[in-house]
Amino acid sequence: MKIYRIYHKVDGFKAIKTKGTALESCMLENGNNATFGLFKNQQFQWSDSAGEKVCDFPFIDGNITVFSEKVFSAIRSMITSCAVNTNIVVEGTQYEIIEANKISNVLNIEQSVIKRFKDGRIMNIKKYVFKQNASYPAMFRIEEFPIFTFVIGEVLNKIKESNGIEGLDFQLCEVL
């Protein structure tokens, strides 16, 4: 099985402006437990300080998964059981915030490269290694560090099949 960490490609693409919005307040107050469903059909603008090109993956703050309707339509049936989607509108164009479910006990702690705070909390994971014998949904976040979203190979392949998509980057993770 192949597992990929997905994230926004920083390459001159526009970003969704959250500064000064209720969404920013919710993220600051709740961190990784923010509930995006509260913002269904809310209108957003592009940030003035971002790039010039609109992409299909304008993640919020670099790690909150946002897909264009084109991409979401391609993978909807694969992820509906493991993620919640919230429709938002950015300057007239529909996007979907995707909140993948958190799963636990799938990260191979011994093989992963993890940087920790003095109190033991995870600061960063430089190398994600997943357990071979675990069960994985099509899309997920890990309970230990729910900052990034991961997909299995079939989901990434379906995304890649959507012609003309831009803005997604991904990293293959080890499965041992």
Predicted feature residues:
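Phosphate/anion-contacting hairpin/loop surfaces
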Residues: 1-176
